[in-house]
Regions:
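Mid-chain, well-packed structural core segment of small domains
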Residues: 53-79
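Residues at alpha-helix boundaries and short interhelical turns
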Residues: 12, 34, 51-55, 69, ...
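C-terminal structural segments of small proteins and small subunits
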Residues: 72-99
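General structural signal for alpha-helix termini and helix-helix connectors
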Residues: 28-31, 67, 81
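Amphipathic, charged-and-aliphatic alpha-helical interface segments
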Residues: 41-55
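Residues within well-ordered alpha-helical secondary structure of globular protein domains
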Residues: 24, 47, 81-84
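Acidic, glycine/proline-rich low-complexity segments that act as flexible tails and inter-domain linkers
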Residues: 1-40, 93-102
Length: 102
């Protein structure tokens, strides 16, 4: 797959040895370290990058997830789960700070 973001290409050109080591680590973790099927691994990466607000990674993970066979419905459902898993807890923490100040 081609690089989705010019900054990634720039990083690879400026730091080829670090890039190669990062690629090796990523391959080891993604492909060789556990029993999860490929589609589930990409679905997890999509959810993690979205929850972490890493939009460049999210775009890449969606593309690779689609290549692994994820449907738009599966990806959309995973992202929808952010509302309760990320959004509501963030609200509750902010609300607790607000209430504590009164």
């Amino acid at each position: 797959m081609k690089d989705l973001h010019p900054i990634f290409t720039t990083f690879k050109e400026e730091f080829p040895e670090i890039h190669a080591k990062n690629e090796d680590l990523g391959k080891e973790i993604h492909e060789e370290s556990g029993p999860l099927p490929d589609k589930i691994r990409w679905l997890l990466k999509i959810a993690i990058s979205a929850a972490s607000q890493h939009m460049i990674a999210l775009e890449t993970h969606i593309e690779k997830g689609k290549e692994a066979g994820l449907t738009d419905q599966e990806i959309g459902h995973a992202l929808l789960m952010l509302i309760q898993t990320v959004g509501f807890p963030a609200y509750m923490e902010a609300y607790a700070v607000f209430k504590k100040r009164r």
